[in-house]
From Swiss-Prot:
Homodimer. Hemagglutinating activity is stable when incubated over the range of 20-70 degrees Celsius for 60 minutes but is almost lost after incubation for 60 minutes at 80 degrees Celsius. This is Galactose-binding lectin-2. Hemagglutinating activity is stable over the pH range 4.0-12.0 but decreases below pH 3. GO terms for molecular function: carbohydrate binding. Keywords: Glycoprotein, Hemagglutinin, Lectin. D-galactose specific lectin. Binds in decreasing order of affinity: melibiose, N-acetyllactosamine, D-galacturonic acid, D-galactose, methyl-alpha-D-galactoside, D-galactose, methyl-alpha-D-galactopyranoside, methyl-beta-D-galactopyranoside and lactose. Binds also the glycoproteins globotriose, asialofetuin and mucin. Possesses glycan-dependent cytotoxic activity against Burkitt's lymphoma Raji cells and erythroleukemia K562 cells. Has calcium-independent hemagglutinating activity towards human erythrocytes. N-glycosylated. Disulfide bonds: none annotated. The keyword Cell division does not apply.
Length: 25
């Protein structure tokens, strides 16, 4: 659960920094 939360957070940060469309739901 913790890893999943961190993964989502990291993905969100990467999405903002890269300004790329989210491919993960």
């Amino acid at each position: 659960v913790l890893y999943q939360a961190v993964n989502v957070f990291s993905m969100d940060v990467i999405d903002v920094n890269s300004a790329a469309p989210k491919t993960c739901d």
